């Protein structure tokens, strides 16, 4: 069983509907976020928790913000995906699941609108709702290293049901996937949510939150320039942490001339010398001087590995 690392509670999320005590899951090292839509306009009961995701985002239409409810730890498997016996793992495949309250079905949208039920139709969601999702994804990237990338194809519902848009991953593709996808992309499942949500805009907002830029659109004039490795998440750079990412960071600090605090060179264990070297690098960059605490975040990582 994996060991949980990093913060397990999304800041500001309510635990009024906490199900982990009754439906304990497996511990995981999360590297995937799956987005769902609830197909309802209020917080679901999830059968008392038996089919709950890790979190639910409920739009507060008057305040123009998302209210978050957390049901399981970030790195505890939740229960919102079909997981067939003997097939690929879904709920337990290093995935954090988020249900977005509202609908992706145009027929349901029209029905609710005619009945006067205020709701979010996620394929045409307002900016504040997309920004709320983006802030969560930015936090997941910063704290858990979930890549701000995902499938190119997000077909509209009902085409997305089953595999009508050809969007659903094979078992092998799912096992290799890292990043953000929809319920519509997960194998062994047939649901088509969240439909044609504006995924490109969500990623744009998430990257703006972190000031990391849009790597997919950046073209360099020097093809031989090494690609910046994906930021693994802050959880790997805490006191006593031992992992390959610490060594990779340390080697790059030495390469860039910021290894003065090492006595014998970088290692796999995060220590005070690493923090001081990172702080020296941060102080050398005007973009980072206001936050030179020695803890690497996405922007520090990108700038360090960009040359």
Where are these regions (language model features)?
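Glycine-rich, acidic and aromatic/proline-enriched surface loops and short helix-turn segments
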Residues: 94, 99-104, 182, 186, ...
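Active-site-adjacent loop/helix surface patches within enzyme catalytic domains
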Residues: 2-148
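Extended, structured, electrostatic nucleic-acid-contact surfaces
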Residues: 280-292
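Second-shell loop/turn segments in exported
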Residues: 84-85, 115-127, 233-241, 263-268, ...
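Solvent-exposed, polar/charged alpha-helical surfaces in well-ordered, non-transmembrane soluble domains
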Residues: 131-138, 244-251, 255, 272-283, ...
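Acidic, Ser/Thr/Pro/Gly-enriched interdomain connector segments
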Residues: 212-268, 273
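Basic/polar, cationic surfaces and motifs that engage anionic cell-wall
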Residues: 2-11, 103-227, 280, 296-307
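Post-signal peptide N-terminal regions of Sec-secreted extracellular proteins
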Residues: 228, 234, 288-290, 305-307
